[in-house]
């Protein structure tokens, strides 16, 4: 199948915003006006096309990025709708890799809200050009110019209004296009499909003139030849201004600003024009870079059908009909259905069964996909972040970095017979979502699920019930403590049992000492056969078993060296089990004498916060037994680096949200284990013995 749309006419865009700024409604309108849907879906009715998971329809929020292709004036738009809730930030990060441009949707009343700020920073990190759409202009308190000031102040960016609103609140009728100085008016309720160009209302001429001047000044500052014309007093044609604004937008010097009300069907078509006019095609962005797995050398792939095939799997989903769907962005070359590709970061081959072009949860089968495009593959065993490429020209693209899960809770099936099913379902969710992790607590043997927040885990539990008919019980969050020793100690372990018939006899002497290099080391110093060779591994096994449960609070023991140096045996009664028990007894006794302590995980925490909340955030980290390591200022944002015990970090996402009105974000990674202060260790031991009583 030959290429349907030239690569220059492709636009891979994300629609990003804070929760409730009207992003999904905006996407619905785009699909309606581009002819992809015949009936407009309303989010508050649970009918939106892009919100296709059951939980999304109920909650009215977008959880997974649905992707869809739409067509406008001969251009193909691949649109990714992303969630605005902080617990699902991973979806935004994940889709940034596949995008070339973003439409940031801001609510006209609230302006720049927390998650938009966080997502703006991610877009900065990934270097994605963007335009701004101020939505909900029909609401009471709508203030387009207020959002303009907000963007400058909170995002430290350079917004350029290319429209001004006509009216506001109930009287919002349309916009003035500042390039050709015409009013665009939506009259009547033709679902917004019809609009007229008129002369600018008399009362708005001065305002429009003032903002047109500001727009021209901002644009010519980025282009020397236009600046010369401007200062010479020449009239600059609208086309030249647009061309210069396109270049400045792609270079991330300026952000074109538009407005409308998606719900009332006004302002969407000019915004689609702006996507085409100002956001980049795959050819306009820098080539993607990666490493050749054979040589380790850096290589680049340009957006061209003639280069070797290279793509990134940016999302994996289980589909009720097709099995696993792997969404991928093609950076170079092309791939056909039925072709075998190389998953270079895993060194394995995969056959692409079918290729689908997605429209929310509907699909169209295509035979080939080319450079710059986005599609979904059926039958490929891949995970998020995998590189798919041509085996003859291998490349591994930069790994996707995801924030670490910050909350964990115990989970078990309501019926024992569902244990196997639970394991399968958890594995499936881990494949789909890189921020969802599963572990087993060796102490309690409980399965723990880890995620980005309570809503994240709630939705996973809900999906188990709905999609897999799996009922589970969940517990409260918990910390994985460990124990160790601070000094050397010696102890004897003697196990003798005489009870008719053959007895049991095992006798050992051991030294234990702190060992920072290894979690556990066993040294055999037996000489002269005082303990026969065949019983020595049993002593080691007995010590290991005893280390599963320390003497402070019953947590696993780490960083210990044990030396077996003496003992005795009985010709008839000695056995492996007797020496294993003797080893365990000796270890427990030695540990009590070796100054045992409780250890807790210390986390490295980085908080990105607007400057005005810096003092409150630092005060809060100090109250959590945190140590502040330093601070870094970036624009209006401060990054605070600290080390904080994990035990103090439960509920932090929620607390940080309330301290900073949700405008701060944080990333937490494990640093090391450290001794717990004595008074806290006593509390932990007390709670542990109560729980196990």
UniProtKB/Swiss-Prot annotation:
UniProt-listed PROSITE patterns: G_TR_1, G_TR_2
Full protein name: Elongation factor G
The family this protein is said to belong to: Belongs to the TRAFAC class translation factor GTPase superfamily. Classic translation factor GTPase family. EF-G/EF-2 subfamily.
NCBIfam families cross-referenced by the UniProt entry: EF-G (TIGR00484), PRK12740.1-3 (NF009379), PRK12740.1-5 (NF009381), PRK13351.1-1 (NF009891), small_GTP (TIGR00231)
GO biological process: ribosome disassembly
Molecular functions per Gene Ontology: GTP binding; GTPase activity; translation elongation factor activity
Alphabetical UniProt keywords: Cytoplasm, Elongation factor, GTP-binding, Nucleotide-binding, Protein biosynthesis
Residues in tr-type G domain copies: 8-283
Coiled coil: none
CC per GO annotation: cytoplasm
The keyword Protein biosynthesis is assigned to this record: yes
Record-listed GTP binding positions: 17-24, 81-85, 135-138
Subcellular location: Cytoplasm
Biological role: Catalyzes the GTP-dependent ribosomal translocation step during translation elongation. During this step, the ribosome changes from the pre-translocational (PRE) to the post-translocational (POST) state as the newly formed A-site-bound peptidyl-tRNA and P-site-bound deacylated tRNA move to the P and E sites, respectively. Catalyzes the coordinated movement of the two tRNA molecules, the mRNA and conformational changes in the ribosome.
Pfam families to which the protein is assigned, alphabetical: EFG_C (PF00679), EFG_III (PF14492), EFG_IV (PF03764), GTP_EFTU (PF00009), GTP_EFTU_D2 (PF03144)
Gene name linked to the record: fusA
